[in-house]
């Protein structure tokens, strides 16, 4: 916080000195007074370099000043600078951590004011060059030395003001960035301070709950284990009873099958005996008839012998 206030004081003092008597301001150097690290600073550097070239009022500059070439170039460079500046400011706003709303609003307002002053300075430079072009066009064929002298004086003053406002904007952006970083660090510290006691309370509560609930949990676990063992024993007994019942049913089935097989064997033997009783008399009768037939045939052959057959001889 001390660092933030120190930067604010330095910025305010610089602004007060810059708003003093213009005659006391030092001559503007040819280069910007800081390193162009940020894109908006680089864009402003290109604007500054082009303006320095215009201030030389060389023959080429004099020729281009009579057209809209210079003002168009300055317009493009000015728009590039403002675009990059807005992007950098938005980036800082996104990085802003927890900070008092009043401080945030004040810093944003100061940066916006400095940004507006810089834009107005660039606009004045462009308008002054446009005015010079109009004056030159109205004095065709006449000497323009006096116009060039006045333009040189105006450009010198405008460049001083541009440099002053650019440095002021850079300082305020530095304060804005420092405030964002310090606000974020302070916010993290405040969050840590608020959460620290809560975390400690939660840790103690967890420890107390663990110590107080250990015994009931152990008893509940033992009771649950006993119920599970009882259920397992009950299921085991039921399984054994069921197995014994199935074994007895299998024995009954086997006995019935053996009994039915014995009955079928007895019935087969009885049927075989009946068949034998049916066919044996028929067989004996057929054998007897066959024997009688053979005897009759033999007796007939014996009583009626067959005479030998005579074969006629062929004549010689």
Swiss-Prot record:
One annotated GO biological process: phospholipid efflux
Signal peptide start and end residues: 1-18
Region named 8 X 22 AA approximate tandem repeats: 76-251
Protein purpose: APOE is an apolipoprotein, a protein associating with lipid particles, that mainly functions in lipoprotein-mediated lipid transport between organs via the plasma and interstitial fluids. APOE is a core component of plasma lipoproteins and is involved in their production, conversion and clearance. Apolipoproteins are amphipathic molecules that interact both with lipids of the lipoprotein particle core and the aqueous environment of the plasma.
Keywords: Chylomicron, Endosome, Extracellular matrix, Glycoprotein, HDL, Heparin-binding, Lipid transport, Lipid-binding, Oxidation, Phosphoprotein, Repeat, Secreted, Signal, Transport, VLDL
Family statement drawn from the similarity comment of this UniProt entry: Belongs to the apolipoprotein A1/A4/E family.
Positions of modified residues (Methionine sulfoxide): 139
Region (Specificity for association with VLDL): 274-286
UniProt modification remark: APOE exists as multiple glycosylated and sialylated glycoforms within cells and in plasma. The extent of glycosylation and sialylation are tissue and context specific.
Record region (Lipid-binding and lipoprotein association): 206-286
UniProt keyword Iron, yes or no: no
A GO cellular component annotation in the UniProt record: high-density lipoprotein particle
Name listed for the protein in its UniProt record: Apolipoprotein E
Domain of life: Eukaryota
SUPFAM superfamilies attached to this UniProt entry: Apolipoprotein A-I
């Amino acid at each position: 916080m001390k660092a933030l206030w120190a930067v604010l004081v330095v910025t305010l003092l610089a602004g007060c000195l810059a708003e003093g008597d213009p005659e006391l301001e030092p001559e503007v150097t040819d280069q910007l007074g800081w390193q162009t690290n940020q894109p908006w600073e680089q864009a402003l550097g290109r604007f500054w370099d082009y303006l320095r070239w215009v201030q030389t009022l060389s023959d080429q500059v004099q020729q281009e000043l009579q057209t809209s070439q210079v003002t168009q170039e300055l317009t493009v460079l000015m728009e590039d600078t403002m675009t990059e500046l807005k992007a950098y400011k938005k980036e800082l706003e996104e990085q802003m951590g927890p900070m008092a709303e009043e401080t945030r609003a004040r810093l944003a307002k100061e940066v916006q004011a400095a940004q507006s002053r810089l834009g107005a300075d660039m606009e004045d430079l462009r308008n002054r060059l446009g005015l010079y072009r109009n004056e030159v066009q109205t004095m065709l064929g006449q000497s323009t030395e006096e116009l060039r002298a006045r333009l040189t004086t105006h450009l010198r003053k405008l460049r001083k003001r541009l440099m002053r406002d650019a440095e002021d904007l850079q300082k305020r952006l530095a304060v804005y960035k420092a405030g964002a970083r310090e606000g974020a660090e302070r916010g993290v510290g405040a969050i840590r301070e608020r959460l620290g006691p809560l975390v400690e309370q939660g840790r103690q509560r967890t420890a107390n709950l663990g110590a107080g609930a250990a015994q009931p949990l152990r008893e509940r676990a033992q009771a649950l284990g006993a119920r599970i063992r009882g259920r397992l024993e009950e299921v085991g007994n039921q399984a054994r009873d069921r197995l014994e019942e199935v074994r007895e049913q299998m024995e009954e089935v086997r006995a019935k099958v053996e009994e039915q097989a014995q009955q079928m064997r007895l019935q087969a033997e009885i049927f075989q005996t009946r068949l034998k009783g049916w066919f044996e008399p028929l067989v004996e009768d057929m054998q007897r008839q066959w024997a009688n037939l053979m005897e009759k045939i033999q007796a007939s052959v014996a009583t009626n012998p067959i005479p030998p057959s005579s074969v006629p001889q062929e004549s010689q």
